[in-house]
A protein has these predicted regions:
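RNA pseudouridine synthases
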Residues: 1-258
Length: 258
């Protein structure tokens, strides 16, 4: 099955209270919950104590079905706090285990979209070595382009000790003025990988001041998980969910008239 959503900003599919107004619930069954996480919301609880998607959805399930006690909701896929987009959560431990296995085997597919600063964007594979700078909460590119060394992600030639191989594909979709819309397919999953690698190529994501984007009227980081595709954990049918572009700048430069 395939479901499409216009953006990640408004609830449409299910009755919902004011408390959960910023979360789009795209699909629900006894095994899965597919949602569109808004920008600047945590995927799961951390030490800040700020609202997080997983906890809010657990409470939503309790309220919706009047469930006493603890509700299981497994987070098998995560998005960084500033990144919006489609996520699937598991309502049973069996579904969580099977979805996690699909991620390990690369059966689970994720497609990201980003608006970057730059005009002459080439379709290419980006290969870097990244190291996490915990003091600044950033990923640092420690070497230039390098050859991959298999799927393990261990440093190859030119990769300093402590670094990890980061690989992604960039596809140019459209350019409007100083902004370009690109599609990103991750080959590895590293901390801040997309943000760090695009910035290293001189095309930082719009609104990403941490990685060198100039200050603009962009409200949020212009990065989203646009599409996910996987096999249903019990029915074994193909599932695909897509979120459309947000209505805010700079995404609105690439939205088509209705």
């Amino acid at each position: 099955m395939s479901e499409s959503l216009k953006n990640c900003d408004k609830i449409r599919s299910f009755p919902i209270t004011e408390r959960y107004r910023n979360i789009d619930i795209i699909y629900e069954d006894n095994h899965l919950l597919v949602v569109c996480k808004p920008a600047n919301m945590l995927s799961q609880r951390d030490r800040t104590g700020d609202h997080d998607l997983q906890s809010l959805l657990k409470q939503w399930l309790k309220d919706r079905y009047r469930k006493p006690g603890e509700v299981f909701l497994g987070l098998v896929q995560r998005l960084d706090r500033p990144t919006r987009g489609v996520m699937v959560l598991a309502r049973t431990s069996k579904a969580a285990s099977r979805l996690s296995e699909q991620i390990r085997k690369r059966i689970f597919k994720k497609e990201y979209l980003a608006v970057v600063l730059g005009k002459n964007i080439k379709n290419r594979e980006l290969i870097h070595h990244l190291e996490k700078d915990a003091s600044r909460n950033m990923a640092v590119v420690t070497s230039g382009q390098a050859e991959p060394v298999g799927s393990s992600g261990k440093p190859g030639p030119g990769g300093p000790r402590g670094s990890r191989l980061a690989v992604l594909d960039v596809t140019h979709l459209e350019t409007q003025g100083e902004h370009s819309l690109v599609k990103i397919d991750l080959k590895t999953g590293r901390f801040h990988q997309i943000r760090a690698q695009l910035a290293a190529e001189g095309t930082p994501i719009a609104g990403d001041n941490k990685y060198g984007s100039k200050v603009s009227q962009t409200r949020h980081l212009a990065l989203m998980c646009h599409k996910i595709a996987f096999e249903h954990p019990t029915r074994r049918e193909s599932m695909q969910f897509t979120a459309g572009l947000p209505e805010e700048f700079p995404w609105d430069k690439f939205r088509r008239p209705r």
